[in-house]
Amino acid sequence: KCSRVAQLEQILPVLSMLLFFSGNRKDDYMEATPYLIGQLLKASDELHALYCKVVRNNQIPPQLVGSALFVAASETPGRTLSQLSVRMAPYLSWAKQYRTKNEDSSGLAGWYLKVFEQIANKLATAYAVPMRWSDAQKAQLFIGYLASFPKQEKQDESNAE
């Protein structure tokens, strides 16, 4: 599995360069719907895995919710978001309750909820899902799925003083 992660980490810069040279700039595509849906799928995987660790005694299925819907997202993005909302509902509900408990991973559950909220807020302003995506949009989806989550903007708070 580690070699797969290493391979994916090598692919990400190549895809980013291809998008750059085709006129798709990072600052633009990181706010675009395909990238954000990729991030949503990634967040879904992470929350699902946390749920399995906490509730199912570390019994993690071979395929998590986000990765199970990744191919469908590249083919029928609107339908996939609908499916994702249904499949993630129990995990999101669990996280909302679990984050208030004083347990080891409860803070992480709250952090994932915050990630979902940030992505949803961006999607609310950028949401435009065509019936099919172009190859460039599929690349943005993939990059969004592989990219790390945005860091907390603590510098902005200290600069505001």
Residues of each region from the PLM?
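Intrinsic-disorder/low-complexity detector
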Residues: 1-161
